[in-house]
């Protein structure tokens, strides 16, 4: 049996975390991480410098070679590079795993009918295998099995710093590109038994978890295609929604930046990437109520 060779696209925070977990897993995988620059703690013998762009016409043979000789590909690139990776894996029939929560990519996949209950003849692909969508929707689906009818399903997820020291009540610990995308897209819900989409940064609520007060609000992509799947499978669900958990006061500031000032994406990414301090002392909250 050939040794499993895993290709990781992206050497940022998430790509490096995946790499380190695979290295210590004990399964002795061959692992190669590809990016334009080596950014973090990756063994140089496991790294390949590779130009990865949005324009397919600019891709060279090196990208194709990287993909087609791997057992599987894990995509840890910024969301706007997903199309390149996804389509190349389909072309060479390489299993593809994607952690992103990009609503635009979901719609593209659905339009192409690459993911369906009767799909045949294309490679195995698994979008939405991160935290949200991913772990949180798996837990929610498991909890639903004990109910014949679900009146309300609330999925609340927050990736937060353990402490906050700024007025934003937030410190970055992952992709700034992904954060901005999450705060700007449409949000998928089931409302009164019907699939619908609502704007990000609305639906504000307060909640208390383990004695700590938080706020939550709609953000894009965190539920993936879960709401649409429940409707298509004719599950008896009245209201289903996903919201991001933050410390109280965060929404007022981001609503001002995103909606009142209507700052362009590149400026928003720059603010979160270069002007909001990072932290490695983070915590993840998953709160599901059914």
Regions inferred by a protein language model and the residue ranges of each:
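Conserved N-terminal Rossmann-fold NAD(P)-binding element of oxidoreductases
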Residues: 6-10
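Hydrophobic/small residue at the entry helix of a nucleotide-binding pocket
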Residues: 14
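NAD(P)-binding Rossmann-fold cofactor-contacting core
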Residues: 30-43
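Rossmann-fold cofactor-recognition segment
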Residues: 45-57
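Conserved Rossmann-fold cofactor-binding substructure of NAD(P)-dependent oxidoreductases
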Residues: 55-67
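Beta-loop-alpha module in the N-terminal Rossmann-like domain of NAD(P)-dependent dehydrogenases
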Residues: 72-91, 104-107
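Rossmann-fold NAD(P)-binding glycine/threonine-rich loop
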Residues: 100-125
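C-terminal catalytic/substrate-binding lobe primarily of soluble NAD(P)-dependent oxidoreductases
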Residues: 146-290
């Amino acid at each position: 049996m050939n040794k499993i060779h895993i290709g990781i696209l992206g050497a940022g925070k998430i790509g490096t975390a995946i790499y380190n977990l695979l290295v210590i897993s004990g399964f002795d995988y061959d692992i190669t991480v590809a990016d334009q620059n080596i950014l973090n703690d990756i063994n140089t013998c496991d790294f390949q410098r590779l130009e990865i762009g949005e324009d397919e016409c600019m891709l060279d043979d090196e990208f194709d070679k990287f993909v087609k000789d791997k057992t599987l590909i894990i995509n840890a690139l910024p969301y706007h590079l997903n199309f390149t990776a996804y389509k190349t894996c389909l072309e060479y029939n390489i299993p593809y795993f994607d952690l992103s929560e990009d609503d635009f990519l979901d719609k593209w996949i659905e339009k192409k009918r690459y993911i369906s209950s009767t799909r045949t003849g294309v490679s195995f692909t698994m979008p939405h295998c991160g935290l949200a969508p991913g772990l949180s929707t798996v837990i929610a689906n498991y909890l639903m099995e004990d109910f014949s009818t679900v009146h309300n399903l609330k999925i609340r997820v927050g990736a937060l710093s353990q402490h906050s020291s700024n007025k934003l009540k937030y410190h970055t610990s992952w992709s700034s590109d992904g954060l901005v995308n999450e705060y700007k897209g449409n949000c998928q819900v089931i409302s009164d038994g019907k699939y619908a989409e609502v704007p990000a940064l609305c639906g504000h609520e307060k909640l208390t978890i383990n004695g700590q007060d938080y706020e939550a609000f709609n953000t894009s992509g965190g539920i993936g295609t879960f709401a649409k799947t429940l409707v298509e499978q004719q599950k008896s669900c009245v209201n289903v929604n996903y919201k991001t958990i933050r410390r109280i006061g965060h929404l007022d500031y981001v609503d001002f930046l995103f909606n009142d000032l209507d700052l362009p994406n590149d400026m928003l990414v720059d603010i979160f990437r270069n002007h909001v301090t990072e932290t490695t002392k983070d915590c993840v909250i998953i709160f599901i109520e059914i």
